[in-house]
A protein has these predicted regions:
Chain A
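N-terminal secretory signal peptides and thylakoid transit peptides that target proteins
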Residues: 1-17
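N-proximal helix/coil linker or "cap" segments that precede and/or mark the start of modular domains
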Residues: 23, 27-54
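A short beta-strand-turn-helix
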Residues: 56-76
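Short active-site neighborhood of thiol/selenol oxidoreductases, capturing the structured segment around
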Residues: 69-89
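Conserved helix-turn-beta segment immediately C-terminal to the redox Cys motif
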Residues: 94-114
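Thiol-based oxidoreductase modules, predominantly thioredoxin-like and allied folds used
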Residues: 111-124, 141-150
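Short, internal strand/loop/helix patches
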Residues: 130-176
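Thiol-/selenol-based redox modules, centered on thioredoxin-like
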Residues: 168-219
Length: 219, 599
């Protein structure tokens, strides 16, 4: 019978996970059962590590902020991607989110925030984004964010605003128009199209809101 | 095709194993090597090889749907198939069920039962949704899932036509979701001829700490039609294999992935659940529900991982049947009825029976039902394709195999991402094995009828296009957003109203060559009138269905009769990731309808 060591088998398995693994003998099954020490990771921490790299970004007001620490942590948020020279979808979604912002009233900038990340950081300087925000009459609690091109691209991928078709993915005009909504400490994340009815976007946001509007976790 | 790096890795690993003394044949038997010489879990089947895909796009940094994780190694076929618990009724419920929502007692229902008086429940059930612990494999740690009555899949209902039941659905799900899942839920009885308020409508979700009474009349479609008064409905509309799953708008994928799924069987005077009567279909321990799922497990924690930010579709690289990864199933040399359900989230499958020691052998078997509805008669097949939420009842005769023989249930449909299968059917032995049948139990009596000799189950209901309302639905993607006729799911928008008692002809269009969609329409079964202008080519599609496979660039016309109940229902893509990203239209059956052709 094969003389395969556990170390070898695991090294091999780690490099290419295996769909089906039949073992010939009971004794082998015992020998190969993982003595693995599984890591205990807080799911909230796992989500942070996987999706929210703590990169430094700049707002339309030239403020330096960190993605997780300053924008996401402990908050209810709406996230989308846009660029200021986009002539088709972005202005419509931005106008729609302006309606959302109005509907959210004084909760904006208190515990609910909107973040629009630029897809065109080379052109979209804080000043350009400031002009864009002013033109759309954007109110407080809504940040337009730019940063280093490679970090903006990493963010786009981490946050899932990509298309599996590489040609479409390269084409900014066909960029992903979804708005992601979520509550970071409650680990509740959903998404809706940016052109959904503003009232329905607000309703969706209430589904991940604090219970009874109180910023506290149920037991 | 695998890229050069994959091939190099495969070759390197293969050499290492061969150097360790394993022959190719042994490698293959272990499931480590395909007949073409590549490792089994090559890109395209393992969905998600983090090492290969990292940084190539998609939620969480990659394109495969698992969010940057490839599951840790697990052995296949070390645990038996789990027999699902049969749900038992209770003598009574306290407080007693009421027609109006019992808000004061904590009921989350908001609409009165419409058919409670007409079909008063004769049996009562109480089922509880809660956080549970479950093991999926001896090689992975105990998982924290959500389940029904402490199990996932939940218990199986054995219901009967003519015996209305009431299920009190108690929500004890925790606020702390462990990373994904929404504890406000709406349980859909998939395929049920169910009044809207009991159907599990996506927007009728209710909170933890509350309950929701579902009234399932268990009646044939046409029950209120005078022409079928003598038979309490149209016997040709009989259903057999249904399932239940969470349908919470925007969170269905997370909640089903977390375990909120189970089976519901319906019997009648023909499909009796007793192989000595009626159609004499294999019964009792030989009538076996198999719920398929694919999942990814985090390589560090060993726990089920859901890619929160994937919008295309999530593919797992571990394959579960009834909640266990790749179980074995010891069978006797006789006929079995297997009830197959693809619970997703996104993978399409095409199952073949494979003898790992003789890959060129083919094993025909009989498909007897499509989407839980018995076909006009059994159809002999060598494979069964299932989009997400499709079901197939099959009869496999294990007396045709050698005593001691092991046969794999192998998915040979190649799929690399959430867009749908590539169209390639892989060679035998190169797919993914979901389960292994071991023909090792002693011979036992078989009173079931050989399906080759069954000439008729139910005729198909007539299709009458003389007076139909015609509607067209385009299933599209625009700016990465899923649409039905250019619009998005919205709980507050009714897209169209079907007049109760009318017939309709719907044209479902997928103009994309890139994406495939399994489209599910609630409440009434439909029949496929045409697929790309021609009658459906597959015999098993000349049937009653509730999920339509919309392949690339396809146009499918389907015929409906809308009867018996009124209220709100959805139509949606059942790739639950697409569904959660708004590929759903909400509509109504009412006393008066509209004729909007492009709602």
């Amino acid at each position: 019978m094969p003389n395969i060591t556990r170390r070898k088998s695991l090294a091999f398995l780690a490099s290419a996970p295996v769909a089906g693994w039949v073992l010939g003998k009971e004794s082998q099954a015992a020998a190969l059962a993982p003595e693995h020490q599984w890591k205990q990771v807080d799911p909230r921490e796992q989500i942070r590590q996987r999706y929210f790299p703590n990169v430094v970004l700049t707002t339309q007001d030239h403020k330096k902020v960190r993605l997780y620490d300053d924008l996401i942590k402990d908050k209810v948020v709406l996230i989308n991607f846009m660029y200021s020279s986009c002539s088709q979808l972005c202005p419509r979604v931005t106008q729609n989110l302006v309606k959302v912002q109005k509907l959210l009233g004084d909760r904006m900038d208190r515990d609910i925030f909107i973040y629009s990340f630029t897809l065109d950081p080379k052109h979209d300087t804080p000043k350009v984004l400031k002009d864009y925000a002013s033109m759309h009459h954007v109110g407080p609690g809504w940040s337009f964010l730019t940063g280093a091109a490679d970090e903006m691209e990493m963010l786009r991928r981490r946050l899932g605003f990509t298309d599996p078709d590489p040609e479409l993915d390269k084409d900014k005009e066909s960029h992903i128009g979804n708005v992601r909504y979520g509550n970071e400490p409650r680990q509740l994340w959903g998404a809706c199209p940016g052109m959904s009815h503003a009232e329905f976007i607000v309703e969706s946001l209430t589904w991940v809101d604090w219970p009874k509007g109180q910023r506290a976790l149920e037991p | 095709m695998p890229n050069k790096k994959d091939i190099d890795n495969a070759r390197k690993n293969r050499l290492e194993l061969i150097a360790a003394g394993l022959s190719r044949r042994e490698l293959f038997k272990m499931g480590l090597l395909t007949s073409a010489g590549y490792l089994v879990a090559k890109k395209g089947l393992s969905s998600r090889a983090w090492a290969y895909d990292h940084g190539k796009g998609g939620g969480g940094g990659d394109g495969g749907g698992g969010g940057g994780a490839a599951s840790p190694p697990t052995r296949g076929f070390v645990e038996p198939l789990r027999t699902l618990t049969v749900k038992q009724p209770v003598a009574s419920l306290n407080p007693a069920p009421t027609i109006q929502p019992n808000t004061a007692a904590g009921e989350g229902r908001t609409i009165a039962h419409q058919a409670f008086t007409k079909f008063p429940p004769q049996k009562f059930y109480q089922i509880t949704q809660s956080q549970i612990s479950a093991t999926v494999s001896p090689d992975l740690p105990t998982q924290t899932f959500w389940g029904f009555d402490g199990e996932t899949p939940g218990p199986v209902y054995h219901a009967k036509y003519g015996e209305p039941i009431l299920v009190r659905n108690v929500n004890n799900l925790p606020a702390n979701n462990g990373g994904f899942g929404n504890n406000t839920v709406s349980t859909h009885l998939h395929n049920g001829h169910t009044p809207s308020e009991s159907d599990g409508f996506p927007c009728f979700f209710f909170n933890s700490g509350h309950f929701y009474d579902h009234h399932y009349p268990n009646v044939l479609a046409g029950v209120t039609d005078p022409q079928f008064a003598a038979t309490n409905g149209d016997i040709r509309e009989s259903m057999s294999t249904l399932f239940y799953h969470d349908h919470r708008i925007d969170f269905t994928a997370q909640n089903v992935y977390k375990g909120l799924v189970g089976q519901y069987l319906l019997f009648n005077q023909f499909d009796t659940g007793d192989e000595t009567t009626g159609f004499r279909l294999p019964s009792g321990q030989f009538d076996v529900p198999m719920m398929f799922a694919d999942k990814v497990f985090d390589p560090n924690t060993g726990l089920a991982f859901f890619d929160l930010f994937n919008t295309d579709g999530i593919l797992g690289d571990r394959f579960l049947v009834n909640g266990k990864i790749q179980p074995f199933f010891q069978v006797a040399p006789r006929r079995y009825r297997l009830r197959w359900t693809n619970t997703g989230p996104s993978r399409w499958v095409q199952f073949f029976l494979t003898d790992p020691n003789n890959l060129s052998a083919t094993f025909p078997f009989f498909q007897i039902a499509n989407d839980g509805n018995l076909l006009p008669k059994p159809v002999q097949v060598t494979s069964v394709e299932l989009g997400v939420a499709e079901r197939a009842d099959v009869i496999i005769d294990f007396s045709k195999f050698r005593p001691g023989q092991s046969i794999m249930l192998e998915n040979r449909l190649e799929q690399q991402d959430g867009r749908g299968p590539t169209g390639n059917v892989l060679a035998a032995g190169q797919g993914n094995n979901y389960l292994r049948f071991d023909v090792v139990l002693p011979a036992v009596a078989d009173n079931s009828q050989d399906p080759a000799t069954i000439t008729k189950f139910y005729d198909l209901p007539t299709i009458d296009l003389s007076n139909v309302v015609r509607r067209t639905f385009q299933f599209e993607r625009g700016n990465g957003q899923w649409q039905v006729n250019g619009q998005f799911a919205d709980c507050n928008t009714n897209r169209f109203t079907v007049k109760q008692g009318s017939t309709e002809l719907w044209t479902l269009v997928n103009s994309s060559g890139g994406w495939m969609h399994p489209i599910h329409i609630h409440f009434e079964e439909h029949q496929i009138v045409s697929r790309n202008g021609a009658p459906p080519p597959l015999a098993v599609e000349r049937s009653r269905k509730d999920v339509v496979e919309l392949h690339h660039n396809e146009t499918v016309q389907i015929f409906f009769r809308f009867r018996d109940f009124t209220g709100r229902y959805p139509l949606h893509c059942h790739n639950v990731v697409h569904e959660d990203h708004a590929m759903m239209a909400l509509w109504t059956i009412g006393q008066t309808g509209d004729t909007n052709p492009n709602p």
